[in-house]
Amino acid sequence: AKTENKTVTVRQTASPIXXXK
């Protein structure tokens, strides 16, 4: 489940970076 957790963290981090694409 470590890989899934990392994917979720990256997705949440990319969300603000994208700025709401």
Curated annotation (Swiss-Prot):
Subunit description: Part of the 50S ribosomal subunit.
Chain intervals with Polar residues compositional bias: 1-15
UniProt key word Nucleus: no
Species: Brevundimonas diminuta
Intrachain S-S bonds: none
GO cellular component: ribonucleoprotein complex; ribosome
Keywords recorded for this protein, A-Z: Ribonucleoprotein, Ribosomal protein
Name by which UniProt lists this protein: Large ribosomal subunit protein uL30
Gene: rpmD
Stretches for region Disordered: 1-21
Family per similarity comment: Belongs to the universal ribosomal protein uL30 family.
Keyword Phosphoprotein included in the entry's annotation: no
